[in-house]
């Protein structure tokens, strides 16, 4: 995979409040073992982890921050 960085803005127009809370809970609970089990190698697992962390931060900034 080439390292071409692209900015992406996601707009959740048809996602319910309950679905966003569930997504926030999921990304909070997801662990390295899930990332690694679904990746072809450690490098991809780290990229998955980084992407999930960014999604979690965006959800937190939007008010979806489960304890």
Language model segments and positions:
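Positively charged, low-complexity terminal tracts
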Residues: 1-67
């Amino acid at each position: 995979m080439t390292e071409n960085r692209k900015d992406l803005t996601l707009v959740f127009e048809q996602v319910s409040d309950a679905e966003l809370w569930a997504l926030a809970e999921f990304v909070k609970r997801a662990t390295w073992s899930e990332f690694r089990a679904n990746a072809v190698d450690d490098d991809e697992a780290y990229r998955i982890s980084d992407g999930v962390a960014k999604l979690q931060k965006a959800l937190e900034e939007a008010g979806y921050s489960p304890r």
